[in-house]
């Protein structure tokens, strides 16, 4: 009788262990909320791009979020991450893939291979319009991806090594950097008609254009990064009605982010100063708040992202590009409130309410 009781107890213990495995598996499908997904680029050719999940309710951080969800690595050099509809699209440059995740759960939907006859296209950035996603590829094309089938349906020839993308007035603006062709860099922005899906114009904006965005008035701003030595970076404004350059700003601006009706800019006051974050007034075309966030808050200021729902500014600190980085959160008046220790070279955030 005692032996039978022991056997029954063992069976109960085994049964409980199986339940725990099932419960653990079910957490993979938990709906994500009240947090942020952070893309960390990793280091070039080290295959260590990653995604961090930060839970705002308890400040818990999972720096292996993508691997936990998929059972594999994200890849080499994650350059962009954007939500659209019920999906999140992640651009992995050196691996030449676009990872598509279910936004609600973070689970993988599809990995899109970005190869052309065995040659890497090297995707860089992504933007959306209607039922299509547009991916800039370093081989000189914009790939059009159907957001339902998740297949590449067209390639549009543009300039050298296209990078940043933005949509304004039913047109796609493409910053052609030519960064891989130094010293013979590109200096143009391609304009693509989003009805015909054809390039119809190139606008000269200055050497090595990279980041680009449109404001609430429909004007387009692009950063021409120069040659990193004798030619400094600058910001150029494009009128999206006539597609002509309407203003060039003298400040050494290297980064831009939309903040309500104005822009956040990262810039240097002079060649010897550290980069800081200011506010650019798009109506009066001046930096109205020269030092909203001091550069001394960072080891390596890598970028800025604004969250309109709470009016907070999220700054990326890359920590000299070799140590795992931080997302530092500031109030709209520039006060540091908190920071989160994430992966290597954080650069993009998708927020969850």
Q: What are the functions of these language-model segments?
A:
Residues 12-15:
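C-terminal motif of bacterial Sec signal peptides marking the signal peptidase cleavage site
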Residues 17-353:
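Predominantly soluble domains enriched in secretory-pathway, periplasmic, or organellar proteins
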């Amino acid at each position: 009788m005692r032996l039978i009781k022991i056997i029954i107890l063992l069976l109960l213990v085994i049964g409980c262990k199986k339940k725990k495995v099932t419960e653990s598996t079910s957490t993979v499908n938990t709906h994500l909320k009240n947090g942020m997904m952070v893309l960390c680029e990793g280091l070039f050719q080290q295959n260590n791009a990653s995604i961090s999940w930060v839970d705002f309710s308890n400040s818990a951080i999972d720096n292996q979020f993508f691997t936990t969800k998929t059972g594999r690595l994200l890849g080499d050099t994650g350059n962009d991450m954007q939500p659209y509809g019920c999906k999140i699209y992640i651009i992995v440059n050196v691996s030449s893939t676009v990872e598509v995740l279910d936004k609600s759960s973070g689970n993988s939907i599809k990995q899109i291979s970005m190869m052309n006859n065995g040659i890497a296209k090297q995707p860089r950035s992504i933007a959306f319009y209607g039922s299509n996603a547009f991916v800039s590829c370093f081989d000189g094309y914009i790939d059009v991806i159907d957001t339902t089938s998740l297949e590449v349906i067209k390639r549009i020839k543009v300039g050298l090594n296209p990078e940043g993308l933005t949509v304004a007035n039913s047109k796609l603006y493409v910053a052609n950097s030519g960064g891989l062709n130094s010293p013979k860099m590109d200096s143009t922005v391609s304009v693509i008609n989003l009805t015909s899906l054809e390039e119809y114009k190139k606008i000269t904006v200055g050497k090595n254009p990279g980041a680009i965005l449109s404001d609430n008035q429909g004007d387009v701003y692009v950063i021409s990064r120069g040659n990193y030595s004798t030619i400094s970076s600058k910001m150029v404004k494009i009128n999206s009605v006539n597609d002509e350059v309407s203003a060039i700003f003298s400040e050494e601006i290297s980064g831009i982010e939309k903040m309500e009706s104005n822009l956040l800019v990262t810039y240097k006051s002079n060649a010897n100063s550290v980069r800081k974050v200011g506010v650019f007034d798009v109506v009066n075309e001046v930096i109205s708040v020269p030092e909203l966030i001091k550069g001394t808050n960072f080891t390596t200021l890598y970028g800025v992202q604004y969250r309109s729902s709470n009016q907070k500014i999220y700054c990326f600190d890359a920590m000299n590009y070799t140590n795992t980085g931080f997302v530092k959160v500031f109030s709209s008046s520039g006060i540091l409130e908190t920071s989160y220790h994430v992966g290597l070279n954080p650069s993009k955030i998708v927020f969850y309410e």
